[in-house]
Amino acid sequence: MIRSRRFFLALPVMLAADEAAAQLAAWYPLEGTDKSFFVELPGQPIYKIIDTTSPAGTPFAYHSYSLEYRRLSFVAQTALYPADVDVRQPKLNLQSALDDRAQRLAGGKWTQVDWKQVQGAPAVESIGPLGGGNGLRQLIVLKGHRYVSLGYMAPADAMRAPEAERFFRSLRLLS
């Protein structure tokens, strides 16, 4: 009888550990189709190619991976900027990306901006409010002509949720 009680007392702990392990195992390792980056997402994303042009009119493409997971949205994008995009002052390029995306924020401003390095490449991480009590967190990295961006949209109080932290910390530049 004592042995049965111990088993039933240990059962919730064993089930919780199994559930945590299953959640970890469910994360999807994503290597960009162009082999430029690696990131983990909590499921398999939808892949799209977004055609665009540089300010000088040279065509190029963004490779975009997006996932809706519960109340959370994850986006990873990369592009190889054409030669006519001047990347000699990467902070200006990163600031331009910040300014462009700030137009979509409630109030048109980021509430938090953190300039940093990711694997030696200039980067900026930012957080800002969206409508309806949601927020946007993004990380943009520019390594030479290689642009990599991670975006995370969720309720404003979930900007530092475990899923977000794992997503952002998993980024690795591969080329």
Residue ranges of model-derived segments:
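Glycine-centered tight beta-turn/hairpin loop motif at sheet-sheet or coil-to-beta transitions
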Residues: D34-S36, Y69-R71, G131-G133, H145
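Surface-exposed amphipathic alpha-helical segments
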Residues: T33, P42-Y47, P90-L105, H145-S175
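N-terminal export leaders
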Residues: R5-L9
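Signature of long, low-cysteine stretches enriched in small and polar/charged residues
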Residues: E40-Y65, A97-K143
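A short acidic-to-branched-hydrophobic micro-motif
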Residues: Y62-N93, V148-G151
